Amino acid sequence: MEQTEVMKPETLEDLIKTLHQIFQSDSINVEEVQNLMESYQSNPQDWMKFAKFDQYRYTRNLVDEGNGKFNLMILCWGEGHGSSIHDHTDSHCFLKLLQGQLKETLFDWPDRKLQSGMKPRGQSVLQENQCAYINDSLGLHRVENVSHTEPAVSLHLYSPPFQSCRTFDQRTGHHNTVKMTFWSKYGERTPYELSVSQENN
């Protein structure tokens, strides 16, 4: 698979332009996208206008719709905020840390026959500027800001975009399908009824 000749992005805007070039292709080179996102050095001046926090839960803030090929968003995690265990609806998911630390816990898909709880398969702590990747063939994950003193900010790319996902109960393995919404779009708060969701990851 051919790789686009890319320069290291100096700004978030540069990164977005290069992502648009890469996603003109019908196929996706996971390593290329991950390397590109990792090569961007986080600069709060680039992304602060998109970083909208909520006191009670983490937020999803849309940055770019990627001509329908991908969604790029910034997630803001207050102290102790975390996601449910969830899938990614057959999409590629790239997660780059812009500020703070996030703990990612991986899980295998639950065995429907056993009706048993879900045991963590592995954990890692993402540091600033690191990038992680997951898709449904690799399993499920939960993301948490375990700090009680520092917020965290992460940049997520989903391709193709999706509007719902499945969240899982760790004790039973049962799942629910939930609709996801944006707390803000392009730096502007979305109407309240459009931004409330059961699970906003």
Curated annotation (Swiss-Prot):
A Pfam family this chain is assigned to: CDO_I
Subunit field text: Monomer.
PTM per Swiss-Prot/TrEMBL: The thioether cross-link between Cys-93 and Tyr-158 plays a structural role through stabilizing the Fe(2+) ion, and prevents the production of highly damaging free hydroxyl radicals by holding the oxygen radical via hydroxyl hydrogen.
Binding residue positions for Fe cation: H86, H88, H141
Any one biological process term the GO annotation gives: L-cysteine catabolic process
Signal peptide segment: none
Record-annotated membrane-spanning stretches: none
Chain positions of cross-link 3'-(S-cysteinyl)-tyrosine (Cys-Tyr): C93-Y158
Gene Ontology molecular function, alphabetical: cysteine dioxygenase activity; ferrous iron binding; nickel cation binding; zinc ion binding
Protein name in UniProt: Cysteine dioxygenase type 1
Cofactor requirements of the protein: Fe cation; Ni(2+); Zn(2+)
Pathway noted in the entry: Organosulfur biosynthesis; taurine biosynthesis; hypotaurine from L-cysteine: step 1/2
Record's keyword terms, sorted: Dioxygenase, Iron, Metal-binding, Oxidoreductase, Thioether bond
Catalytic activity reported: L-cysteine + O2 = 3-sulfino-L-alanine + H(+)
Top class in the EC scheme: oxidoreductase
Family assignment from sequence similarity: Belongs to the cysteine dioxygenase family.
Enzyme Commission number(s) from the entry: 1.13.11.20
InterPro entries in the record: CDO_1, RmlC-like_jellyroll, RmlC_Cupin_sf
The protein's role, per its UniProt record: Catalyzes the oxidation of cysteine to cysteine sulfinic acid with addition of molecular dioxygen.
Cofactor binding, note field: Binds 1 Fe cation per subunit. Ni(2+) and Zn(2+) can be used to a lesser extent.
Top-rank lineage group of the source organism: Eukaryota
